[in-house]
Amino acid sequence: MPFFNHLDASLTLGTTGIGFDVATPVGNYVQLRAGWAFMPPIHQHMHFDVQVGETKESKYDANGNRVETKFDKMAALLEDLSGYKVEDEVEMIGRPTYHNLKVMVDVFPFIRDRRWHITAGFFWGPSKIADGYNVTEAMPSLLALGMYNRLYDKTMISYESVQKFRRGEIAPYEIIPVFSIGQYEINSPTEIESLYKMLSSYGRMGMPLGKMTDENGVSHTYMMVPNEEGMVKAEVRTNSFKPYLGVGYGGRLLKNDDRFHVAVDLGAMFWGGSPRIITHDGTDLARDVHGIKGKVGDYVEIIKGFKVFPVVDVRFIYSIF
């Protein structure tokens, strides 16, 4: 019986990426194959709208005239304060990042016709298979957006302390300032209340993606906002260990040369359920958020549908000995 009496090397191209493997027989009907494959980082551009508050505003009136929105007002304020121009959309780049080791067992059920084979095995690699991040050109807008939300949040906290002061629960010096620069502080109750009135009528600024339900069962708009680094990111994750089952067909590549062969493998890589799409704040877009619209929503629905990843690979084989 032939055990490890010859060795094949292959270049692989297909839905698992670009890679290589080596194979050797283990008996008359079985071949052991191992290799590695990676997917080149093909970039896909996506755009996210930026808005103030949870309700989307129209930029035009009934007559088609451009009107000033809450976003326009806040963008002008932020540009005046920070010098950064805030755009009404943020561009992100999505790319595949997966690469896997693979171990396969090919079984040739027909001893007189070794063109057909059945394959079982597994892929193993990082759980992150894709990611997304904002482009450099979006950084000024994201930094300004983060500054606005910081001002908004601190104003809400300061306003609560002013209300306690109004009720006589705390002393004037215990009022939490909106911010301080050296010894200068914005802690005047009147100033804080005026700022609160303006900002609370607008809401926080962010990129609305869809609806999500909190722990109390209340539905609200999920607004993606930049992290502490002023960036927005997302990752697509699956199980690291991914079983595989498939079939294949192969034959000689050149009519009179047994050293060169080609084989096509068709099968399924089992991801262990729908992939998770995790943003930088820990939100799972595939499970926690629904009703995502536009191109981003299309991508999310496609990714959610791939509980099993279709494998279509072509192997160009060279017999070393």
What is each stretch, according to the model?
Residues A9-L11, V22, L32-A34, V105, ...:
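Membrane-embedded beta-strand positions of outer-membrane beta-barrel proteins
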Residues H6-P41, E91:
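Long, hydrophobic N-terminal alpha-helical segment
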